[in-house]
Each structure stands twice: as structure tokens, then as C-alpha cells.
């Protein structure tokens, strides 16, 4: 067995819960921010150009 006895306690609670702003199951309880929309970290909604693919499947740079 590897790891310390404390490592066995890691899987008991949920890391992510449902986010108040985006509704996705991505709000980190311990870090107090949403991995999907950035709620708790920034006022602006987290969004990147690589998230959505264009209609013809080619990404324009």
C-alpha cells in the first residue's frame, strides 16, 4: 500500500458540487471557485475560443 493513512480520507467527500452561476457540477468546495465558469474567482464568465468548434469543423486563428 502506498501513501499515508490520510490519503484514504480523500475520496469520502465530493470535490465538486453544482455551481450557483452556471449550474454545472464544477464548483470546487475546498478552493471556492467553479472550474467551468470561474465563479468565485472572477466576475467575468470564463470563456475561451477553443471551447467551441466552428460549423465547418475548422478553427480560424
Swiss-Prot record:
One of its GO terms (cellular component) is ribonucleoprotein complex. HAMAP family: Ribosomal_eL37. Pfam families: Ribosomal_L37e. Zn(2+) binds at residues 19, 22, 34, 37. This is Large ribosomal subunit protein eL37. GO terms for biological process: translation. It comes from the Archaea. GO terms for molecular function: rRNA binding; structural constituent of ribosome; zinc ion binding. Belongs to the eukaryotic ribosomal protein eL37 family. Gene3D superfamilies: 2.20.25.30. InterPro entries: Ribosomal_eL37, Ribosomal_eL37/eL43, Ribosomal_eL37_CS, Ribosomal_zn-bd. Its cofactor is Zn(2+). Keywords: Metal-binding, Ribonucleoprotein, Ribosomal protein, RNA-binding, rRNA-binding, Zinc, Zinc-finger. A zinc finger (C4-type) spans 19-37. Binds 1 zinc ion per subunit.
